[in-house]
Amino acid sequence: MKRVYSKIESIVGNVITVMAQNVKYGELAIVKSKDTSSLAEVIKLDREKVSLQVYNGTIGISTADEVKFLGHPMQVTFSENLFGRIFDGAGNPKDGGPRLEDNLIEIGGPSVNPAKRIVPRNMIRTGIPMIDVFNTLVESQKLPVFSVSGEPYNELLVRIALQAEVDLIILGGMGLKNDDYLKFRDSLEKGGALSRTIFFVNTANDPVVESLIVPDISLAVAEKFALQGKKVLVLLTDMTNFADAMKEIAITMEQVPSNRGYPGDLYSQLASRYEKAVDFEGAGSITILAVTTMPGDDVTHPVPDNTGYITEGQYYLKGGRIEPFGSLSRLKQMVNGKTRDDHRTIMDSMIKLYASSKESIEKKAMGFNMTEWDEKLLKYSGMFESKLMDLSVNIPLEEALDLGWEILSSCFEPKEIGIKTELVEKYWPQKKD
């Protein structure tokens, strides 16, 4: 059976077309040009007309170049030798270390059978009060971080990578600016977390289509480690770049566009990645946090809009803080009843008072007379934002709850906050003489 073809029928964008037989969808090929060789993946079959997506781009490729089909889909190596290593979007070493080619596994496999999943039950502590107290991250949860360009979403991921109580961090970068990539690397190395981290990074200087592999390669490795009993946290940034790469390929393939030019299968493509989040019975787990930037701060943009139907809530980053009103962890009730008996009460009461403080801020801005209660709310708002909402705050959950009580006692009387007497008697700070 012929597996090497020496004629390329057409080259359009990053897609080449050859006439070939016995080729499977998703099969990998090597395109050999005069000076280089590039990986390509079969993305369309029309009888013997085969379209391949070239991951390194088609610059330098001619119609006389050789295409060799490998007979298998994209693969990545899997072993503990990956710990502390940095790879590009195609799994090639980016850190100057040796190439790893043993124990290869296929990427892009199906999601775990729902019957094999267990109900989420464990909290992942991050040391960030706006997560731990108010929208708890739960093991095996899938959550996006909605943001706009310019917000410190990558800095937030760095904080989570450094502080999250997990066994392994897998960072998948898509279209990362070189400065952001270096910041991830240097921050994790300085913080001592690089040894438990695996990087798969497609930078803005790399071919755009290479970013399509990053989520699949990251999640394939995560699944294998989870099956070995490790608690894995996958951090992806930025899923909008991933969707834009899909859009670029769809336009090249002359697919009928859907909303704002994105392919019609955008939802299923995103879902197939997010649904990899799982907690295995008797083994480990995969938790996914994925940055999704919103062009123009538009939550109805196709990427965040579709994402919201797939995930179990979202963190909404605005003004350099995790916005409490736009953020939601739909699984927090699975775990915040197991932490401390005042957790849910503090969470509900503080957010309720913070919402009331927004009305007082508006009254002050419009020149209305301020009541004593308004002044208390204004003081509370300032303390809440500086001591709990600030992303630089790094304290354990129990200290964050104690701090919540301190803030309440600094601004209000016990009877003003609507909390049960037994909890007030147990946790209300005693004033020092």
From Swiss-Prot:
Keywords carried by this UniProt record: ATP synthesis, Hydrogen ion transport, Ion transport, Transport
Keyword Acyltransferase annotated: no
Q: Has UniProt tagged this entry with the keyword Mitochondrion? A: no
Molecular function terms from GO: ATP binding; proton-transporting ATP synthase activity, rotational mechanism
The record's annotation in CDD domains points to: V_A-ATPase_B
- Taken from the record, one Pfam family name reads ATP-synt_ab_N
Q: What does this protein do?
A: Produces ATP from ADP in the presence of a proton gradient across the membrane. The V-type beta chain is a regulatory subunit.
Family note:
Belongs to the ATPase alpha/beta chains family.
Name under which the protein is recorded: V-type ATP synthase beta chain
Q: Which organism is it from?
A: Borrelia hermsii (strain HS1 / DAH)
